[in-house]
Amino acid sequence: MNQVNFDTTRLRQILKKTYFFQSLKMNELDDLISHIRAASFQKGSAVIKQGEAGNAFYLIATGRVSVWIKKAFSKTKVAELFPDQFFGEMALISNEPRSATIIAEEDSSFFVLYQNDFNKILMKNPAVAQELRRIFYERKQKR
């Protein structure tokens, strides 16, 4: 993972499109943005690995990733994610190991919110926390 600089305007646009952040007021959005970092991964790199402890939530800024789940002796590609989509929330909400491996299918950049900051945002914004819990249970049922 490489740390990179990012465009705050682009980040604000992505956050406004991310439905569970849409309820945030401008000052809350600014607070959220102040906690976000940027990172990039090269094509073929594992962004997160199934079974590892989760420590961050990712919003895709550029590129494309694939979602892989390993069961017994097989690995299955279950999804592809594109800019403005997110991943990594499940392990942060459940405090369980990562439920999937995410691979960069091309050089990709991300906006990253680490666990401590993620938890602070959820504590300050119950509507965001509630929506993320709903998404968590929805995704968990699909797996």
Q: Where are these predicted regions, by residue range?
A:
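Cytosolic regulatory regions built on CNB/CRP/Popeye-like sensor folds
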Residues: 1-143
